[in-house]
Amino acid sequence: MDRYAEQLHLTMLAKAPEIILFAYNQLLGVKLSPRFRTPWQGMGTSFNYDEMTAPIRQKDGTSIEPTTMARIADVVLKQTDKLIGKLGNPIGIKSYKPFHVAGDDFLQNYLGMIGLPMDIRPVFPKDQQVVLLTAQAAQAPELMTDIRKQLQSGRDVVITSGLLKAIPEKIAEIVELRCTDLKALVNDFGRYGQAGRDLLIPQVQYYTNDAWEVVSAGRPLTGGVSGYPILLRAPYAAGNLYVLTIPDDMGNLYDFPAKALNEIRRIMSRDMDIYLEAPSKVGLFVYDNKTLVVENFNDEPVEVRIVTDDEVTRLENLENGDILAPLPAEPVQSRRPVTPKN
């Protein structure tokens, strides 16, 4: 039941112009039951089961006892409606997906669940510091021209290992990188921490000193023999082309250690001037009026840091007015991108 409430909440946060309630027959036909009360109730979650099932007091002094799941939609829509009027238009990391294409299917959904807000566009974005290209962009006729212009202007492109695999000859016009048929089992991300399980990834190969590993993984990486790039940087002209290695099971992105995710978020979020430091399954919604929403999809509380630029001196909770003071900045561990000099 919490998941249904969550879907309504997220749809409103996305500022969808219309909402269709799924399975309306179930809303009317399924009776409320104590078994719907989840273990995480009472942990400060935005959805409160006990308040939802409480009697509804009428103007004439009488009360109505909620009996069906329709009450969920009533509570969530009213609750979120008080907030969304304070939020601007959603913004995110722009990802180029031409019409009528396939490849890296649903990847943006998984990236959103690791704190990378996605904004999918059918035309190559020409006004962004960072553009994400998945295998969906492989068939775009002007793709390499657009990539060159982006890099030559001093801006960055992030491609997935899936796109590198799909168009190796085209990418080779810019950088000498290859996504091979070889696989690697990894679980150790070195200074960025350990994964909770073994992850199967494609092996991305490159020439040493022509490209640099920003995030690496091995089994083990620390004290081991081999390491493999998770996030690889290859300078070109005045910009950088990054390769983000996607596990064979996209759900394994959720198993990346938090510090590795933090570095990926930092590099990909330049256009928003804000990013999360958090474990996976924490979503970030950013809006164009300097507002944001952080959503925890885990079954337990997690610690989250919001990293902003120097212009932001405090954060205000839009629901209760609480002020969050900034914490001391922590040093960035990775090599920062270097702009090549001619």
Language-model regions, residue ranges each:
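Short acidic/histidine-rich motifs immediately flanking catalytic phosphotransfer sites
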Residues: K126-V131
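A conserved amphipathic helix/loop scaffold
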Residues: Q108-N109, M118, P122, T134-N342
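Hydrophobic targeting/anchoring helices
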Residues: M1-F106, L232, L244-T245, L253-Y254, ...
